[in-house]
Design a protein with these regions (language model features):
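A short, small-residue-rich loop immediately preceding and capping a beta-strand
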Residues: 34-56, 60-71
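A generic local structural motif
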Residues: 27-30, 50-52, 86-88
């Protein structure tokens, strides 16, 4: 369905690959097998697929377009990826999304546990932003003002939106 939508929009898909791995060696191999005429990397799916696509964009210095199918975390927009390196999960630098396309009907159709996980991820930002500032004040980290602003806006939007349950129309607005 998505491929036909891209085609109808005049977007030529040069390479289509279904991933079942986040092993860094596999991702590197796939990234450098992409045609040289590739203009962007699109990640459509859950966390593993998004992380793999982000890292491919990073390696090839290409824009990365994120198309998440669940809202279990905000990883679809972050500039890091969780990959397997020597069979261990590691966080590596990746490409921040150039654009994010979200079909709220797809997000709504995901299992509720993913929405609750996303709520937990959002609520944790409230304290993590203060932790980040504290670390910066004590020389343990550097604050990225843009990332801080985006996170604060997301938290403020979430806590100020008047919804009672995840089924309310305003919840995913």
């Amino acid at each position: 369905k998505v491929l036909s939508s891209l085609h109808n929009a005049g977007i030529e898909v040069l390479e289509y690959c279904e991933l079942d791995t986040v092993d860094i060696d596999d991702i590197i191999r796939i990234a450098f097998a992409l045609p040289n005429s590739t203009q962007a990397v699109i990640g459509l799916g859950g966390g593993k697929v998004i992380d793999a696509a982000k890292y491919m964009g990073f390696l090839r210095k290409l824009p990365f377009i994120s198309v998440p199918t669940s809202a279990s975390s905000d990883g679809f927009s972050s500039a890091s990826a969780s990959l397997l390196i020597n069979k261990r999960r590691s966080s590596v630098p990746a490409r921040m999304a150039y654009g994010i396309i979200v079909d709220t009907d797809v997000i709504k159709s995901a299992p509720e546990k993913f929405l609750y996980s996303g709520i937990g991820d959002m609520v944790s930002k409230i304290t993590s932003l203060y932790d980040w500032q504290f670390e910066a004040e004590h020389g343990a980290a550097q604050v990225n003002d843009f990332a801080m602003m985006i996170a604060k806006k997301a938290v403020n939007s979430f806590v100020r939106t008047p919804f009672e349950t995840i089924h309310d129309r305003l919840f995913l607005k």
